[in-house]
Amino acid sequence: MKTPHSIEAFLPNAQSSIQRSRLRKKLLAWYGLHRRDLPWRANRDPYRVWLSEIMLQQTRVAAVIEHYREFLRRFPTVEKLAAAREASVLAAWSGLGYYRRARMMHAAAKIIVRAHGGNLPQSEAGLRGLPGIGRYTAAAIASIAYEEPVAVVDGNVERVLQRVLGKRLAGEGLWVAANELLDTNCPGDFNQAVMELGAVICTPRAPQCLTCPVVEMCATRGELAGTVKAPAQEKREIHYALHCRNGDDEVFLVQRALDAPLMAGMWELPELPSPCGAEIPAFSLRHSITITDYTVRVVRAATPAEAPGKWISVGKLHKLALTGLARKIFRKAVIL
């Protein structure tokens, strides 16, 4: 029986199970030959899969690679993560942004150790009971680490499905279509293949249709660009003070409130009024957070303004939960 969102209902080129089987084989063969060599693909350990999926949420692959390796060096197992102090976890996460992900992962690790003997639940349903693990993340972990036959839907999968099927799907319709197309014999690889196709071939702009492994089965040849338009970037200018003493061996930092809506408890440089009077910035840099592009002006000064803060040894900065912007400023100033 055809459901309203079934593949047979809207894909003339894949009406038969034979056509769907061809699509799966072509996509898996392409993935086997052309997939990117990413560190989390070398090991299907559930903890590592979980870590990579959380880090990849709203974060570029290039940025995740460096942090993934360092995080595993500090917390190689779920037990090590559960036993760590939150400040240490946030310090290891510094630079990735969206720190709620780190806090939720830390909380989930404690539950896994306490209630599951240190082993992640082996089903999508069980994984969704943990903090910070939603439908997509649970399906990704379950299919990649445990080969549970469940499909994933993220932005890349949505775009591929809409173009291949020639239909603007949304909500549950996407999940139904993804699960019907899923290769249940190797769901982990198939899910990663669809996401990889969306990331490197079936891109939002200028899709590489000539090199697409399933182009002959695609209903649109890349013409359907998607349903969500990226919001326009807001532009802002902000100013920070870089206070140093003892030959630049110590820097002055302030801590965000523990109940702050963003980056709670993280350490950063004191912000200055904009514009900051007659002070001439020592240097400037660019920084982006979600839909805002910042031009950051940094002023060097010998003594801090009257602000609740703390002098921190430069040698201890790598252990501190710094905001991504603070870390970027220190690198620009050749302090980190």
In which residue ranges do the predicted regions lie?
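Intrinsically disordered, low-complexity, charged terminal extensions of DNA damage-control enzymes
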Residues: M1-R36, A42, E196-L336
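Catalytic cores of DNA base-excision repair glycosylases
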Residues: F10, I18-S21, K26-L210, V214-M217, ...
